[in-house]
Amino acid sequence: MIARHRDLVGLYICGGGMEGVIAAAREEARARLAIVCNELTAKSRAGLIDGVLTAVIHTPTALMAERALEAMNQAIEAGSKATATQIVVPFDLFLPTNI
């Protein structure tokens, strides 16, 4: 896709296949292509360091689980008076400059 679409300036990888996109971007070595993906892994960290990736949006899963458990405990304690709860967990944004 990267090779076929020369007018492509940005790519967001929101699901699987990040490793393949990183490998393809390394082969193409296009300076103008901004690539953003989800979750900081060894491969995405290397992509940031190498300059292949522009940014990584990372979900703090431990914090998300902690907040979900807190909400469940509150719902159990509230019993029939429990109401819907919205939990906001901030994301981490990693760039080549802060990795």
What do these predicted regions represent?
Residues 1, 29, 53-55, 74-75:
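Short, hinge-like loop/turn segments at secondary-structure boundaries
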Residues 50-62:
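Short beta-strand elements at the ligand-binding edges of bilobed clamshell
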